[in-house]
Curated annotation (Swiss-Prot):
Gene: accA
Catalyses which reaction(s): N(6)-carboxybiotinyl-L-lysyl-[protein] + acetyl-CoA = N(6)-biotinyl-L-lysyl-[protein] + malonyl-CoA
Superkingdom of the organism of origin: Bacteria
Protein name: Acetyl-coenzyme A carboxylase carboxyl transferase subunit alpha
Enzyme class per UniProt: transferase
Molecular function GO terms recorded: acetyl-CoA carboxylase activity; ATP binding; carboxyl- or carbamoyltransferase activity
Homology family: Belongs to the AccA family.
Biological source species: Campylobacter jejuni subsp. jejuni serotype O:6 (strain 81116 / NCTC 11828)
Gene Ontology terms describing biological process: fatty acid biosynthetic process; malonyl-CoA biosynthetic process
Keyword Signal applies: no
Xref: InterPro entries: Acetyl_CoA_COase_a_su (IPR001095), ClpP/crotonase-like_dom_sf (IPR029045), COA_CT_C (IPR011763)
Example of a GO cellular component annotation carried by this entry: acetyl-CoA carboxylase complex
Record carries keyword Cytoplasm: yes
Amino acid sequence: MASYLDFEKNIQQIDEDIINAQIKGDTEAVSILKKNLEKEISKTYKNLSDFQRLQLARHPDRPYALDYIELILNDAHEIHGDRAFRDDPAIVCFMGYLGEKKIIVIGEQKGRGTKDKIARNFGMPHPEGYRKALRVARLAEKFQIPILFLIDTPGAYPGIGAEERGQSEAIARNLYELSDLKIPTIAIVIGEGGSGGALAIGVADRLAMMKNSVFSVISPEGCAAILWNDPAKSEAATKAMKVTADDLKSQGLIDDVIDEPTNGAHRNKEAAAVAIADYVKKSLNELENIDVRELSANRMQKILKLGAYQEA
C-alpha cells in the first residue's frame, strides 16, 4: 500500500478514485482520472519547499540502495564483513556490472518493514560498517574497479558500543583513505545525507545528489532544538540550513544534481534508477580518461576548497 505525505493528499484522493473506478469497470472515468492525476502531480511537485523535499528524502516508499542495486547492476554479488568484528547490515557492498562496466557499489541501507529496519539499525552504520566499506574500497583499488557510493543515512550510529569500538576513528579513517584511492569514484546522495555518517562514504571524484535528497551536518529537528529550543521549528531550520541539492550545488559543495521523475523517485523507481545509471556511465567515461594519480590529486584539491571563503 502506497504511503502519502501531507502535501500529497489530493494525489492520494485521485489514486483512490482511480482504484474505485477500476473496480467498477468504468474505463472512461479511469482515463479522465489519470489525466487529472498527471496534472495534480505536476502542480504539486512544481514548486516544492525545502521542507517538502526533506519529507520526500525520508519518504517510506523512496528507493533505497538495495533497490537501485537490483535495478542497475547485472550479475551482482554481495561482499560481507569488515574482517575485524562483524558484518554491519546498515552498509551493503556489491560487485557487478553496470552495462559492460565492472563496478563496485557501496551503499547505506535503511531497511523496509519493522524487522528489516531494526536489523539494519535504520540505516545508521556502526564503525564496523564503515570499516567494511573501506575494506571493499581497498579491494576495488587493488583490482582497479571503479566505485559507486550510495549515501542514505540519518547519521552514523551514536550508541555507546559504537563509540567504544571507535566510531569517530572509523569515519576519519575513511575520509583519509578514500580521498587517496587510485581509482575513479562517484558518490550520490539518494535520500538523507546525515553529517559524518554520510561523509564517511562521500569522498569521491564526483559528488551528486538526487533532486529530492538532502545533505546536512545535523538534522533540521536537531538544529531547531539547539537554536530555538523547539524541534517544531524544523521547517524554518530546513530553509535556513540550505540542505537541498539545488542549494548545495549553488554553493559549489556538490558537483551535480540528478533529476528525478516528475512525481518523485518513490513513485517511479525504475525511472530514477535509469537516471542514476546514466549519470554514473557518463561520469565514468570522463573519469576513466584521467590518470589515477591526477584523480587523487584533484580529489584532494576539491576537499581543500571546502569551507573556503573570501572576506569582502
